[in-house]
Amino acid sequence: RSNFMLPATIRDNAPYTIEAWILNPEIAENESVADFTSSHNELEKLMLVNGTEPRCGVMNHYGWYEDAGYKEMKTLEGKWQHVYVCFDGRIESIYINDKLISQKDIQLLVKPSQFMLLGKNAEEAWPFSGYLHSLKLWDEYIPYKKTNKIN
């Protein structure tokens, strides 16, 4: 749990980019890698997930349509995953290992956050059982570029 808040520049429907390198030997249904918001309200959530839930197993906004999962997530057990999420204020694109797995036109309502959490969500549930090599969050849209680092 952090002692700092989400940057003030990430509010409402503001652009952001998230990048992470994850290794998870056994991926459960819902595992929160990082919850960037302490909110519990619909569309106010920015949570990076590493789970098998096909509806929200990669990115959770506490929406329904706005969330994103990956039906083939279980095939990534024991393999490094390069996860890249970029949102320009309208379109959210999600890539795993250079593959576009989701691209949606969404509307978010991100509010000021009291803290950020690694390894579980703001409700202190959905524990992450894997390894996190790096995690980056930008308050701007950075289009995805192929990494050439994925086997």
Language-model regions: role of each:
Residues 5-8, 69-75, 105-107:
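Beta-strand-rich interaction surfaces with strong enrichment in secreted/lumenal proteins
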Residues 57-82:
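Short, aromatic/His-centered strand-loop micro-motif at the edge of beta-sheets
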Residues 151:
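Aromatic sugar-binding interfaces of carbohydrate-active proteins
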Residues 1-58, 77, 91-92, 123-127, ...:
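Extracellular glycan-recognition modules
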Residues 104-132:
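Flexible glycan-contacting loops in extracellular carbohydrate-active proteins
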Residues 79-93:
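Localized edge beta-strand/strand-to-loop motifs within extracellular or lumenal beta-rich domains
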